[in-house]
Amino acid sequence: MRRNNKRYFTFPALYGMMERVKNINAQNKDDTMDHRTEILPGVYLTAVQSDKFKTGCFSLNFLRPMCKEEAAANALLPSILLRGSKDHPDIASISARLDELYGASIGTLIRKKGEVQLTGFYCDYVQDEYVEEPVFAPVMEFLAELLFAPRLENGAFPEAVFESEKQNLRNAMLSRINDKRSYANAQLIRAMCQGQSFGIPRIGEIEDLEHLTAKSLYAHYQALLETSRVELFYMGSLAPEKVAAVLRKTLSRLPRAKEFTPVGTTPNPAPRPVQERSETLDVTQGKLSLGFFTDITANDARYPALVLAATVFGGGATSKLFLNVREQMSLCYYASA
């Protein structure tokens, strides 16, 4: 609607816009198909079949509750597993094996979604039809080797590898303050969600990292394999049934408990008093971060409308914040939502 020759968007109007976009997309379906199934106890595969790309993508995610006691351990674990296995004990041999797989790549994943921490790996590789031999299955076998047969010394991760990766994670934690924009947003979340899981940083806290040892991390690794729900994501040209068959075979060594650690996000619908926090640093540009609670989670039917509302408000160079606060009023260097 319009007021004083300016356009204002209400939440119902944005929801209606989102529904119209969904209808348009439904009318223009292409050859992309997605499929989700439980291939092993507590292991779920989402496969998106498409022949549009020459490179296939895959990710393996262990889902853990976002808690202070294990956030740092979950963040440290993938990088240590990627440092060596029984048959490929160092970075050089791992790189050589990936070169043999037509330049495939394997990297670590540490993400936070709501009150859930995801830790694992992602892979990129050439699609099978572009080479003379299968690539997806051997890449998955190599990933399983790194995951299930890590290099060990005296019943624990090698001390030198552990200390090296622990220092890398420590440096990452200490360097968070160097990016003042993301640091301000992180401090906002920490203040808003004090005492809640969502307030914990994605890679954990440095004091919890310092308590870890090579032996305690290996014990955590064993428990993580057994008790975590696992989400697998595949994008490529193979049929979902073939992908599932390959993964059932390569992940057959995954130990499974009778019950898995529950994960989820609790909405925060109750009103809260307004909080204000400030921090003084030696900077030339101040940062102002504003946070608002809603009761909408990613599974809510209203979530796409909320995302669209944030985009209209501050999602780019045509947003209300950018055009008004930055361009017209010249009050800041950047403004976004």
Predicted regions and their residues:
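His/Glu-rich zincin catalytic helix
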Residues: 10, 18-101, 205, 218-324
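Acidic/histidine-enriched alpha-helical segments
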Residues: 93-95, 149-173, 261-269
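Active-site glycine-rich loop that binds ribose-phosphate moieties when present
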Residues: 211-218
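N-terminal, intrinsically disordered charge-dense segments
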Residues: 2-3, 21
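A common structural junction motif
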Residues: 141-152, 250-258
